[in-house]
A protein has these predicted regions:
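Electrostatic, structured charged patches in enzyme active sites and in nucleic-acid/phosphate-binding
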Residues: 1-244
Length: 244
């Protein structure tokens, strides 16, 4: 990454192009710190679709905001699922803006992420083995631009396969219709002390009725389980939410 002393020269001519309810805009970077990209902006570009395409674009129903959010590849989808399950995330925008530099180069980050404390993270998803020197320079420039506004910037590679497998499973129970208040209260009481998953489920009721609610609670981490240790089984240790 370029030394911080060079950031003013790099970022001084940066402009941000985005689409909001008021129309298309292209503003100096310094004027965009307060733009609510996650609330008021549509994607600055679409996803191409053609025969023989090597990636798989689509839409993810983002349970946090109850809106669809786009992804351009399965790798992006996996990271989007993780953002949806993260209780600290309150909003996400796909393809939120295009950064323009004075030398004619430009870049569209994959996601703008708003956190519950009001801070923001800009996310690019690209596997390590798919980053060229030109890509690396654009990611570096993007990080500098974001940091100059107080935003965090992260380039994510391939998501952890075990965590991803668990989140994909739990995501099937993320919809609010799965929630049953009485069952949820009973589960939170029994798992106030950590124990194997099915050991806690059986006293609450029939597994076919109780497990969906348990998975619904594990999705936003209202109950805690180590999703990175192994794929969820009857013996997975479930306990209180880690934030308690």
């Amino acid at each position: 990454m370029a030394p911080a002393a060079l950031w003013p020269q790099v970022n001084g001519g940066v402009e941000v192009e985005f689409n909001s309810s008021g129309g298309s805009s292209r503003l100096p970077l310094a004027e965009c710190a307060a733009v609510a990209f996650e609330l008021d902006c549509s994607p600055v570009r679409g996803f191409p679709a053609f025969r023989g395409q090597g990636n798989y674009p689509g839409l993810w129903w983002f349970s946090t905001t109850r809106e669809h959010v786009g992804y351009e590849s399965w790798s992006e989808r996996d990271h989007l699922i993780a953002l949806d399950a993260d209780p600290a995330v309150v909003g996400v925008a796909s393809q939120p803006f295009r950064l323009h530099w004075g030398d004619g180069r430009h870049h569209v980050p994959d996601y703008f992420v708003r956190l519950s404390d009001g801070t923001a993270t800009v996310l690019d998803v690209r596997a390590d083995d798919r980053i060229s020197d030109a890509d690396a320079e654009l990611f570096d420039r993007s990080e500098q631009a974001c940091r100059s506004l107080g935003w965090a910037y992260r380039r994510a590679g391939v998501a952890d396969p075990v965590v991803t497998a668990n989140l994909r499973w739990l995501s099937g129970y993320r919809h609010p219709r799965v929630y049953r208040p009485a069952v949820a209260a009973a589960l939170e009481a029994v798992f106030d002390s950590a124990r194997p998953l099915m050991t806690g489920v059986r006293p609450v009721g029939e597994a076919i009725m109780v497990l969906p609610v348990l998975f619904h609670l594990l999705w936003p981490r209202r109950l805690g389980v180590d999703l990175s240790a192994a794929v969820l089984t009857e013996e997975s240790i479930v306990g209180p939410a880690l934030s308690r």
